[in-house]
Protein backbone atom coordinates (compact mmCIF):
# COMPACT_ATOMS: atom_id res chain seq x y z
CA UNK A 1 0.00 0.00 0.00
CA UNK A 2 1.37 3.44 -0.94
CA UNK A 3 0.70 5.58 2.15
CA UNK A 4 1.04 9.33 1.70
CA UNK A 5 3.90 11.22 3.31
CA UNK A 6 3.33 13.20 6.49
CA UNK A 7 3.84 16.41 4.49
CA UNK A 8 1.05 15.40 2.07
CA UNK A 9 -1.18 14.51 5.00
CA UNK A 10 -0.53 17.85 6.69
CA UNK A 11 -1.65 19.71 3.54
CA UNK A 12 -4.91 17.73 3.45
CA UNK A 13 -5.53 18.21 7.18
CA UNK A 14 -5.05 21.98 6.93
CA UNK A 15 -7.68 22.13 4.16
CA UNK A 16 -10.23 19.70 5.60
CA UNK A 17 -9.91 19.72 9.40
CA UNK A 18 -10.73 23.20 10.66
CA UNK A 19 -12.28 22.05 13.94
CA UNK A 20 -9.13 20.83 15.74
CA UNK A 21 -7.44 24.27 15.70
CA UNK A 22 -10.72 25.82 16.89
CA UNK A 23 -10.56 23.61 19.99
CA UNK A 24 -6.85 24.31 20.44
CA UNK A 25 -5.63 20.79 19.62
CA UNK A 26 -1.91 20.71 18.87
CA UNK A 27 -0.61 17.97 16.61
CA UNK A 28 2.93 16.62 16.38
CA UNK A 29 4.58 13.59 14.84
CA UNK A 30 6.99 11.39 16.80
CA UNK A 31 8.38 8.12 15.46
CA UNK A 32 5.91 8.29 12.55
CA UNK A 33 2.96 8.47 14.98
CA UNK A 34 0.53 11.34 15.54
CA UNK A 35 0.39 12.71 19.09
CA UNK A 36 -2.21 15.34 19.93
CA UNK A 37 -2.32 17.55 22.99
CA UNK A 38 -4.90 19.90 24.41
CA UNK A 39 -4.58 22.23 27.40
CA UNK A 40 -7.97 22.39 29.12
CA UNK A 41 -9.14 26.03 29.12
CA UNK A 42 -12.28 27.72 30.39
CA UNK A 43 -14.02 27.36 27.01
CA UNK A 44 -13.65 23.54 27.34
CA UNK A 45 -15.54 23.28 30.63
CA UNK A 46 -18.93 21.63 31.05
CA UNK A 47 -19.07 21.53 34.85
CA UNK A 48 -17.11 23.60 37.34
CA UNK A 49 -13.42 23.15 36.49
CA UNK A 50 -14.16 19.93 34.53
CA UNK A 51 -13.68 19.37 30.81
CA UNK A 52 -16.92 18.74 28.88
CA UNK A 53 -17.27 15.18 27.56
CA UNK A 54 -17.95 16.51 24.07
CA UNK A 55 -14.49 18.11 23.98
CA UNK A 56 -12.94 14.78 24.95
CA UNK A 57 -15.05 12.98 22.32
CA UNK A 58 -13.90 15.46 19.67
CA UNK A 59 -10.28 14.95 20.63
CA UNK A 60 -10.75 11.16 20.60
CA UNK A 61 -12.36 11.23 17.13
CA UNK A 62 -9.40 13.28 15.91
CA UNK A 63 -6.87 10.93 17.55
CA UNK A 64 -8.51 7.87 16.00
CA UNK A 65 -8.99 9.47 12.58
CA UNK A 66 -5.49 10.90 12.24
CA UNK A 67 -3.94 7.64 13.43
CA UNK A 68 -5.89 5.95 10.64
CA UNK A 69 -4.68 8.56 8.13
CA UNK A 70 -1.01 8.20 9.08
CA UNK A 71 -1.00 4.41 9.06
CA UNK A 72 -3.62 3.16 6.62
CA UNK A 73 -4.92 5.67 4.06
CA UNK A 74 -3.42 5.17 0.58
CA UNK A 75 -2.61 8.09 -1.71
CA UNK A 76 -5.74 9.35 -3.45
CA UNK A 77 -8.01 8.16 -0.62
CA UNK A 78 -9.67 9.79 2.37
CA UNK A 79 -11.17 8.36 5.54
CA UNK A 80 -14.28 9.16 7.53
CA UNK A 81 -15.64 7.99 10.86
CA UNK A 82 -18.23 5.21 10.54
CA UNK A 83 -18.69 4.88 14.30
CA UNK A 84 -16.75 5.22 17.51
CA UNK A 85 -17.24 4.65 21.20
CA UNK A 86 -15.60 6.26 24.17
CA UNK A 87 -15.26 5.22 27.79
CA UNK A 88 -14.75 8.10 30.21
CA UNK A 89 -12.57 6.92 33.11
CA UNK A 90 -11.40 10.09 34.88
CA UNK A 91 -12.04 13.82 34.69
CA UNK A 92 -9.80 16.26 32.85
CA UNK A 93 -9.63 19.47 34.86
CA UNK A 94 -9.09 23.13 34.05
CA UNK A 95 -5.38 23.64 33.37
CA UNK A 96 -4.61 19.98 32.64
CA UNK A 97 -2.66 19.18 29.49
CA UNK A 98 -4.07 15.99 28.01
CA UNK A 99 -2.41 13.79 25.39
CA UNK A 100 -4.06 11.55 22.80
CA UNK A 101 -2.44 8.60 20.99
CA UNK A 102 -3.85 5.85 18.80
CA UNK A 103 -2.99 2.46 17.33
CA UNK A 104 -4.40 0.43 14.46
CA UNK A 105 -6.25 -2.74 15.51
CA UNK A 106 -7.42 -3.99 12.08
CA UNK A 107 -6.79 -2.91 8.52
CA UNK A 108 -9.17 -4.21 5.85
CA UNK A 109 -9.64 -3.21 2.22
CA UNK A 110 -12.23 -0.53 3.02
CA UNK A 111 -12.53 -0.38 6.83
CA UNK A 112 -9.90 0.35 9.48
CA UNK A 113 -10.41 -0.13 13.24
CA UNK A 114 -8.38 2.07 15.56
CA UNK A 115 -7.99 2.30 19.35
CA UNK A 116 -7.00 5.41 21.26
CA UNK A 117 -6.24 6.73 24.70
CA UNK A 118 -6.31 10.20 26.20
CA UNK A 119 -4.33 10.68 29.38
CA UNK A 120 -2.88 13.34 31.65
CA UNK A 121 0.83 12.61 31.99
CA UNK A 122 1.32 15.22 34.74
CA UNK A 123 -1.18 13.41 37.00
CA UNK A 124 -0.43 9.91 35.65
CA UNK A 125 -4.11 9.20 34.94
CA UNK A 126 -5.98 7.72 32.02
CA UNK A 127 -8.84 10.07 31.09
CA UNK A 128 -10.61 7.95 28.47
CA UNK A 129 -10.29 5.12 25.97
CA UNK A 130 -11.92 4.89 22.58
CA UNK A 131 -12.31 2.67 19.54
CA UNK A 132 -13.46 3.66 16.07
CA UNK A 133 -14.18 2.26 12.63
CA UNK A 134 -13.13 4.30 9.60
CA UNK A 135 -14.18 4.02 5.98
CA UNK A 136 -11.58 4.45 3.23
CA UNK A 137 -12.93 6.15 0.11
CA UNK A 138 -11.81 8.10 -2.95
CA UNK A 139 -12.71 11.75 -3.24
CA UNK A 140 -15.70 12.51 -5.45
CA UNK A 141 -15.82 16.11 -6.65
Language-model segments: residues:
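Terminal targeting signals and extreme-terminal segments of soluble enzymes
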Residues: 1-141
Amino acid sequence: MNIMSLEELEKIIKKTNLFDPYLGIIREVKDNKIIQTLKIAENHLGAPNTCHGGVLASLMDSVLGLTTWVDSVPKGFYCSTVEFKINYLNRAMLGDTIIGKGTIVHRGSSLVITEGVIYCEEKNILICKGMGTFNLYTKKD
